[in-house]
Design a protein with these regions (language model features):
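Conserved catalytic core of the tyrosine transesterase superfamily
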Residues: 1-325
Length: 325
């Protein structure tokens, strides 16, 4: 469902989002930021469709407990919108603030035992009146995230028609930056999804969300995060806070590291496999995937000597959320 814009920039926001989507971009997360900006603008004296310097500077201020990457995304979305307004003939302010999008947090790589414990606890979830589908959604969602290395946004945007259970394929229609790809599932995961389809989605239309709420809306990212933190607690895995995790997105990182560790242990040619893995993950470049070589070597020191020839040139000081997410 499209978001409603009610602030002083509402018509231009709707036009801006529509043009981005016509160009093939999903724009869901950016639309949410733009709606926040439009609402934020209600407290300022705004000339028709003009982002003033005062408004731009106020929006760009770092908020309490806000991460650098979230602030970066907020400010850059305002910048893109302001530039668009200028192109439409409205003299909007373009801030010269330069922000770093580098994120130095090291992802948490779950051990295989921790993954088993998380799955076992998810499988034992009881029904809950406030979230009646949680006990059915979470066990399958977590297995899809770990088994296929999907981004959480990609999983939650899956429609029934995007899940090909006959061939064991997931059709990611709106990956990062609007990219599409097909993601194969294992036989066991396909069977799990078939059971879920029969129990939860029987009779649903093809455009229904695969991971849906009781209101037939996509299961919310915040709801998934809250449930996941509860599972971590029950599994005896310390949750160190928003900045340090573990987070639901670490299941994607763990999928990659476990796969690379398996290949390295079996002496598979990583040079040949990295391009395939890169396509599977939806990365735009092999360099984004190569970063995982370092992370895998750190998580599994015993295979470092097998990866030396691959990791010697891919040890950046920090990594970009924009590339690795």
């Amino acid at each position: 469902m499209a978001l409603q814009f009610t602030g002083p920039f509402a018509p231009m926001c709707e036009q801006f989002v529509a043009e981005r989507r016509e160009a093939g971009r999903d724009y869901s997360q950016q639309e949410k930021i733009l709606r926040m900006f439009d609402n934020f603008s209600k407290d300022y004296a705004v000339e028709p469709f003009v982002v003033s310097e005062e408004l731009a500077q106020a929006w760009s201020q770092k908020r309490p407990n806000e991460t650098d990457i979230n602030r970066y995304n907020r400010v850059m979305e305002m910048q893109r919108f302001s530039k668009y307004l200028v192109e439409q003939g409205y003299p909007s302010f373009l801030t010269g603030i330069r922000l770093s999008k580098h994120y130095t947090h090291t992802p948490y790589i779950f051990t295989e035992d921790e993954i088993r414990r998380i799955f076992q606890i998810a499988d034992s979830l009881e029904t809950c009146a406030s979230v009646p589908l949680r006990h059915q959604v979470m066990p399958v969602l977590l297995r899809v995230l770990y088994g296929c290395g999907l981004r959480i946004s990609e999983a939650l945007e899956l429609r029934v028609a995007n899940v090909d259970l006959s061939n064991g394929l997931l059709h990611i229609r709106h990956g990062k930056n609007g990219r599409e790809r097909l993601v194969p599932m294992s036989e066991s995961l396909t069977q799990r999804c078939q059971i879920y389809m029969q129990n939860v989605l029987d009779g649903k239309e093809p455009d229904a969300f695969f991971f849906c709420s009781r209101l037939n809306q996509p299961y919310s990212r915040s709801g998934v995060g809250k449930s996941f933190r509860g599972l971590l607690w029950d599994a005896g895995i310390p949750y160190l806070g928003k900045e340090r995790g573990p987070s639901i997105h670490d299941l994607r990182h763990t999928f990659v590291c476990h796969r690379l560790n398996q290949w390295a242990s079996n002496e598979v040619d990583l040079t040949a496999m990295l391009p395939i893995l890169s396509k599977y993950l939806g990365h735009t470049s092999i360099s984004a995937t190569s970063w995982y070589l370092r992370l895998t070597a750190e998580a599994y020191p015993g295979i470092v000597h097998k990866m030396d020839c691959f990791t010697k040139d891919v040890f950046p000081v920090s990594w970009e959320e924009n590339d690795i997410e």
